[in-house]
Amino acid sequence: MRKRIVSVLLILALFHQSFMTASAESETSLTREEIDNVLWGYTIDPSIPTFGEYKSANPSNRPDKAYNIDAADFSRYLEGDEAAEPEIMSGYMGMDGDSVLTSENSVIEYEIYIEEAGLYDISLLYYPVEGKSSAIQRSFFVSGVLPYRELALIEFARIWQNAIAKQVTEPGYVALVWEKDNQGNDLKPRMFESPEWINSYLRDVDGYITSRLPVYFEAGLNTLTIAALREPMLLRGISLDNPPPPVAYADYKAAHDKAGAEPVSGVSVELQGQYAIRTSSQMLYPVQDSSSPALTPVSPRLLLNNTIGGHSWRFSGQWVEWDFSVPESGYYSIGLNVRQNFRRGAYTSRKISINGEVPFLEMEDYLFAYSQNWRNETLSDSDNEPFLFYIEAGVINTLRFETVLGSFAEVISEVRESIYELNSIYRKIIRLTGVKPDRYRDYQIERSLPELKGEMEAVRDRIEQAINEIRRIDTRGGGQERVLVAMRDLLNTLINNPERFARVLETYKASVRACGTWLNEAMLQPLQLDAVQISAPDVEHKLRNNSIFHRIWFELSRLFFSFFIDYSRIGNVSDSDEGDTITLWVGSGRDQANVIKSLIDERFTYDTGINVNVMLVDMSTLLQATLAGQGPDVALQVAGDLPMNFGLRNAVTDLSRFEDLPEIRERFDPSAMVPFEFNGATYALPETQSFPMLFYRKDILAELGLEVPRTWDDVKIAMAVLANDMMEFGMLPNELLFATLLFQNGGEYYNEDASRSALDSEEGINAFKIYTEFYTDYKLDRSTSVEERFRTGEAPMIIADYTTYNNFQVSAPDLRGMWGFAPVPATIQPDGTLNGVAASHSGACIIMEMSNKEASWEFLKWWTSTETQVMFGREMESLMGSAARVPTANLEAFSMLPWPAADYAALREQFSRIRGIPQVPGGYFSFRNVNNAFYSVTTPFEELPARARIERSPREELTDKVILINDEIRYKRSIFGLPLYGE
């Protein structure tokens, strides 16, 4: 973590300039720490250009000469900041020569002598060795300098395949046979990594730049430094070259005509989408779709794997491949059974390649229009004339469809930059007016901010350019530009009269937020594919079984079967007399339940012989169902306060009865067990665990000259600086925040035997006083979403659950590289040491008392194991993206999730000092009354009813509420026959 942002930026600027002027005649002395400093601040360092700026500043010549560098010919290798010797592998997986294994914390450097200066494309020949199953990430420096921002993060794909029961060779392709559950439904196949040697050029990770990313090399000796950010990689070689771009279709066709190519006749090969042989992502597995009788295969009763893609095939760079062969060499047309019903009024784009090459320019960015229903689309030009593809017979051909932003890439890039500038303008305005300006006051905005009009005009022009480009691309008039038009019109109004900001500030903020939503949606390019038909030009491409009669009969059949199918049951369903059988309740969504069930069937039942019936239910009915004898054996995703309360009512099993519990406890941080233990009993195992972190905006802190705070005293200093600029520290009042302050100040929730509250101790009262002062003395917002204010910059530092990281990764592409996170601020102790403890909360998995206990315990041990939690976490990310990253409580599994190394280090630092909040009988009254006391102290007089307008100190309020807490604890302990305080 970098402590002084301004200092870092000065160092970065000097560092960058020094290497710009240094001779490239020797290897650089670039250290890992220096690399990390550059990567930490590259988005806010003005000395590091964007790709567009870099291209404009350098000559555009592209020499013909190519350079190939063996990976083993490196000049320097570091592990962290220490020089090391990497592992060298010879002849690995059929590859001749020596390859170098680079770790996820490595730096490897090469010296390259360039004969002719110019732009060169860089490609890596690599093998994706086993890691955390996420994309490999690297950054690239040339002669000690990060050439431009896009090279700070380059991703290299892994290759995935479906695990199948068997495969059957059909004419021209390979069909897959799926495992089935005992209801006849296809099981979703497990994806497994199928690594192979890959040659990959450097490309923009966001897809905003559709071309390869070239680098300008000076003539003479240069150094190329590759810094690992995530995942290991086996590197065989590096190439610098300039391959020719694809030619236009007319030239492609003319060249093959000249070579004697002719259309074939009467030939057709159909590739089923679900039989994709390779994909770039775990997310791209077969999809079960029963929406149309035109799909192949399809059933009104059963769930069959019959398509691929949809919402899971939406991110730039994701690709799917099929292998096929044709009986004759010649020209073929390609038809697709597709549906793009995800982005109304918009196109989605795919790059189509055959045998690793884009056949002609038009396939770099092929557009698929919106359609509510399945349709057959033949790849055609703007005049609906089918494209003809020359395909060789007698070889295995590979067809790849890759998601690209295509024509929209430049538009999206412009809008992203515009949003950043619009938020910057918003922050300038609120520094003058505050977030709630007086609409009748003249703030003299134009005089105070003379540069504002020019900035708004520049953003308006950029948005206008984006609008025009959208209209050029979208000739159907889908209306994709409406949000941008509204923003442009508002800017025109404000340019004419900047004083109107005082009246329309909320409208401006909402319009910027709408642009952010538009950006998120525009970046997604979903497409669902049923089949690919590679046919002779004289063979008609069409949907089968798609008449009105077929559709009516199919829908009536679906309706009929819906009366007999129990949709709450997932996968295999076993009777109680089929050996050991347990019932599992899952309280999350169907996607999660399907993943859990598939893991159970593939692993747990197969290994143990214990059958598990999975049911998707509302967990609020758990206690009632158990008391009625209709409950499950095991329940997952249970709230952390339930196990102890259920245990006292003899509704769940005390796990301390199992001899191997101490061994299982070692999987978790001790804090994760705290909520589930009471009076010597253990009522649950932790399933998830999360805790707060400090999120901060690098760009805004740099503007203000602020450090990332280490202590709460630092936070208070930062608050004063933020207040001067009408910004604030974002921190919503909640139990985790209060408990964090309580623990850091030496307080406890309860006394040693949990028979009374300890919140009225001096430590507890002091913690409560500090807690309330943030909202009385520093006027922090108590209700507005901190995430939204973080994005706009109103709150450039926030305290939020660490899972917020996942949300920002997905929902804030405009802030990529401009934010970071760190452990929560610490409290300075009397001896000068820092107490940085953070409170955590845990989700639980429990065994009900009326259960098959031994079988249920076997399941719980399996479910919380490292292997299972890693598989579940990766499956969820493959299904729903990084926003669904599971906050697993298993420490080893947590370390194996695909966190970038720097982010994991920050999380691990906080994970090493967390504490759980204990649960006791009547404990639900504790924070409820703390919260009541909090609002009594912090609510302004004018918001209180007249009878309640009595000024109360934090000490008085909390002391009064502790009396109520103790009364409730005493009452509950008497009900359960537990010793009472003082008796």
Q: What residue ranges belong to the model's regions?
A:
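Extracytoplasmic/periplasmic substrate-recognition and gating elements
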Residues: 116, 328, 812-885, 912-919
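Periplasmic solute-binding protein
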Residues: 646-650, 669-708, 727, 733-755, ...
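Extracytoplasmic
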Residues: 25-537
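Conserved N-terminal structural module of periplasmic/extracytoplasmic solute-binding proteins
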Residues: 25-26, 330, 411-416, 420-644, ...
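Glycine-centered hinge/linker elements that transmit conformational signals in sensory
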Residues: 753-783, 824
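Extracytoplasmic "Venus flytrap"/periplasmic binding protein-like
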Residues: 600-671, 675, 699-707, 796-797, ...
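Long, aromatic- and glycine/proline-rich binding clefts that accommodate carbohydrate-like moieties
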Residues: 822-826, 874-940, 977-983
